[in-house]
Curated annotation (Swiss-Prot):
Topology of this chain in the membrane: Single-pass type II membrane protein
Organism: Oryza sativa subsp. japonica (Rice)
A GO biological-process term: xylan biosynthetic process
Gene: IRX9L
Protein name: Probable beta-1,4-xylosyltransferase IRX9L
Membrane topology, Lumenal segments: 107-446
GO annotation, cellular component aspect: Golgi membrane
Amino acid sequence: MSRRNAGAMQREGSVKDWEEFDPSPSPKLAYSQSYVAMRGLLTSVASLDLVLMSSSLKSAWAAISSHKHARSLERSRSKGMSLKRAMLQLLVCFMVGIFIGFTPPFSVDLPGKIASENGRLPFDGDAIDRRQMVERQGTKLEPFVAEAESEASSEPQVEEGPPVPAMLDDEADFVEASPIVHSVNDSGIVVRKHLIIITTTSVRPHQAYYLNRLAHVLKDVPPPLLWIVAEWPYQSRETAEILRSSGIMYRHLICNRNTTNIRKIVVCQKNNAIFHIKKHRLDGIVHFADEERAYSADLFEEMRKIRRFGTWPVAIHVGTKYRVVLEGPVCKGNQVTGWHTNQRRGVSRRFPIGFSGFAFNSTILWDPQRWNSPTLESIIVHSGGRGGLQESRFIEKLVEDESQMEGLGDNCTRVMVWNFELEPPQVNYPIGWLLQRNLDAVVPIT
């Protein structure tokens, strides 16, 4: 054996002996365990770092995503608000456009513009002179020429009175200064004077017949017309029903005076109607229409021609002799020159006509100074006087003489009112119908 082999054997033996008797672990084993432990530690640390990094990334991403979501919500909310604002502005602009589209163009000087464009409509403003309008329009304003001439004449000016009560607001107005019924060119607008018809009535057998007959005549008269019915001693249901069913604008008054004198009762009824006109200052033509008279509808159209006082003839049926007497004016044109009269001898009447033979302007009652009335006392009907003196005294308070009267009915040649004495003065039972005592009972009641 060589020295090299012996040395090798000696090293192996020494190594085996060292390894057999050395209590410490093998250095190769220790290195592998520490490496594994270190590697596990590093792995756990790396995994922990990854977990921490992933959680931080997740939280950061969540924060970023939540911020983005919040910003998107705010952005969507702002977009919604702006959209609503835009829609509201669009709606407002649309409504304003519709309002402007339906509003007709106008100017501040509206009356002057209308008067300049349409000569048929007169205005009494300071900027428009009536005479200049008539000269500029020529024949187009023929209906208003009479009005302008009457205003320039010496006749008293009829100013605008207080407003008519609410019960008359729905009625058509009329031109006071114009004495005729006229139409405004071809527009179809007809201006008529207001008629105020006064009728006295009382409960009696033929009351319904007379009122219905007069109501049918008045219903055929074109409006405006007011029917004032004064009743005594109370407002009966039958009369109220007749007035309601007539289709005419009416006033139902009463005279509750405690008397049995027929003349005083009629005077009370007429004065109550006059006081009603004075109180409300009704403007129109007044006529006392007796319910027992027979009227032609043409008479009421003739009344609208009256400026101050108008009169016409009345035919009176005298008793059972089948004779007719004419009572009323004698005219030359429309000027009253004399009278047809049936008055008795010894009775002198200044104006020999009855209440059914004249009509007058109502402004004489509540403003007589406009017409230079001959009397300053209150214009009422007095109960004194017989044989037509009552009517004559009432007319004397309205006019001075025949020059202030106007004759109607084709120069006072037409008869439009008839007075027929049809109703008996008193309705009684025939003789023998009224028993003074009761009959004796044939079968007594036990």
